[in-house]
Design a protein with these regions (language model features):
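Membrane-embedded alpha-helical bundles that constitute the cytochrome b-like, heme-associated redox core
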Residues: 2-268
């Protein structure tokens, strides 16, 4: 009986591939994009100033639990806060949306490739030869993404309330509020729309409302909700990047208006 011949494929070294395309461009762009956002958002979070302008507040600082602006929920910096410890309202809340993005299924695949080269791209050799997956610490902690989802949904409601407040402008002469729309109002509203599209299209939410394990819900309402989330989920990468850019731009817009560099034009 003839025996089949077997061929052993030697493991690829780091960066080795037979791909003829410029596969390295995408992970490079991801590295640049995420690095830029991380540096800017970290800098902005530690500033602790120029984060509000009239009825506008930066999404990095909302909800402002304690602080010196009119947007503060519970008043100024609490007396029990250590004098030696830097205080910024953003540091009290950014962990929630930051954790949601950090553990996002799409972002995990993106920054594993861009920052850890694990792997750099499909069919491209990676630095290590063994596969560990997300079964050991610290990567097993990525499973908390489903819990960050609840906080992210709550933040969408809070930011939507900020848009509502951005529709009311106070007259400095009389102190009365009147309805209006400024460029900043639109910037904040677009931010909620994009963050909503990214959050509602989340893989965890799709699984949550889809029904039971390995079985779709039979309720027509649940099925329609599942179809809606699935529609957003098909463009989850696009929602992830556009919303990331816009939330950073929203902070920049409010910050530059507060610094007097940009002028907020009233539309209505």
């Amino acid at each position: 009986m003839a025996q089949a011949q077997t061929t052993t494929i030697p493991p690829r070294g780091f960066g080795q591939t037979m791909r003829p395309d410029t596969w390295w461009i995408q992970p490079l762009l991801v590295f640049i994009g995420l690095s830029t956002f991380i540096v800017y958002s970290t800098w902005a979070a530690f500033q602790g100033k120029n984060y509000f302008f009239g009825n506008y507040i930066s999404p990095f600082y909302s909800p402002e639990l304690f602080g010196g602006s009119p947007h503060s929920w519970f008043g100024p910096i609490p007396g029990w806060w250590p004098q030696w410890l830097l205080f910024s309202p953003a540091l009290l809340v950014l962990w929630a949306p930051g954790g949601f993005r950090l553990t996002c299924y799409y972002y995990r695949g993106a920054y594993y490739k861009a920052f850890w080269a694990d792997p750099p791209a499909c069919t491209v050799g990676e630095p290590r030869t063994s596969y560990w997956g997300e079964r050991s610490f610290p990567l097993i902690m990525q499973n908390v993404h489903r819990y960050f989802l609840y906080g992210a949904l709550l933040f969408i409601l809070i930011l939507a309330y900020d848009v509502w407040k951005a529709l009311w402008f106070v007259d400095p002469a009389t102190g009365r509020s009147s309805f209006g729309i400024g460029v900043g109002t639109l910037v904040l509203a677009i931010n909620v729309y994009l963050l909503g599209g990214y959050t509602i299209g989340c893989h965890s939410l799709r699984h949550l409302i889809g029904g039971f394990r390995d079985q779709l819900a039979k309720s027509p309402g649940c099925y329609r909700a599942y179809a809606c989330v699935s529609c957003l989920n098909r463009r989850h990468m696009l929602w992830a990047w556009v919303s990331l850019f816009w939330v950073g731009f929203t902070d920049l817009y409010v910050r530059l208006c507060a610094m007097g560099i940009w002028h907020d034009f009233r539309i209505v």
